[in-house]
């Protein structure tokens, strides 16, 4: 497994899971009967992370970022309608987060903003535009409680840390590696 999903490895694999194919990124590789199979545990891990925290995301989703994890989040939430905010190639720019957030009940941060060694969000006031009961999933797991997570929680929103995704990914990867059926629970 690798912490950051990569697309470069795909050309060397014999087969892709539906999630890996749809997301265009792989973060788990297994060897099956002499063949390599690539999986993306981000998308099902994001879904499981929401479920483990008792959040049933409804309404539109705002995915912040445009890399492999963002593609996985968009795929995981595609049935809700997704707005992508990114510096390049998004539906909206980072400056337009407050306006975009007004339309959404789910926010996923799939950028390194707030991660140890990276700059924080310049402004978290977009959280004030979210309706009560909205869910904010920060995929960053170091630090465990990011500024985004803490700000969402302070506003009474459902806040989920990246540690939830990391644990869900580990369970999924273990199941892929071993064929076991570990149950996914909240961390």
State what each model feature region is:
Residues 48, 157-181:
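Active-site capping/gating segments
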Residues 57-60, 133:
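Phosphate-coordination loops involved in phosphoryl transfer and adenosine-cofactor binding
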Residues 40-43, 50, 59-78:
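Glycine-rich adenosine-cofactor-binding loop
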Residues 91-160:
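Rossmann-like adenosine-cofactor binding region
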Residues 45-56, 68-71, 90-95, 122:
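Active-site glycine-rich loop that binds ribose-phosphate moieties when present
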Residues 79-94:
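NAD(P)-binding Rossmann-fold cofactor-contacting core
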Residues 7-57:
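Glycine/small-residue-rich loop that forms an oxyanion/phosphate-binding "nest" at active or ligand-binding sites
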Residues 2-4:
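Short, small-residue-biased leader/transition segments that mark boundaries at the very start
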């Amino acid at each position: 497994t690798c912490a950051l999903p990569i697309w470069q490895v795909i050309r060397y694999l014999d087969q892709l899971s539906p999630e890996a194919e749809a997301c265009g990124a792989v973060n788990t590789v297994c060897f099956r009967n002499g063949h390599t199979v690539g999986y993306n545990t981000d998308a099902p891990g994001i879904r499981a992370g929401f479920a483990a925290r008792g959040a049933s995301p409804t309404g539109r989703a705002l995915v912040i970022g445009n890399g492999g994890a963002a593609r996985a989040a968009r795929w995981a939430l595609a049935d809700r309608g997704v707005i992508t905010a990114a510096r390049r190639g998004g539906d909206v720019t980072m400056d337009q987060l407050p306006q975009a957030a007004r339309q959404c009940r789910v926010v996923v941060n799939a950028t390194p903003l707030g991660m140890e060694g990276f700059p924080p969000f310049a402004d978290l006031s977009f959280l004030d535009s979210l309706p009560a009961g909205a869910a904010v999933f920060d995929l960053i797991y170091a630090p465990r409680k990011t500024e985004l997570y803490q700000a969402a929680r302070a506003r009474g929103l459902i806040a989920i840390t990246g540690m939830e995704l990391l644990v869900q990914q580990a369970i999924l990867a273990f199941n892929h590696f071993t064929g076991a059926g570990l149950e996914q629970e909240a961390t």
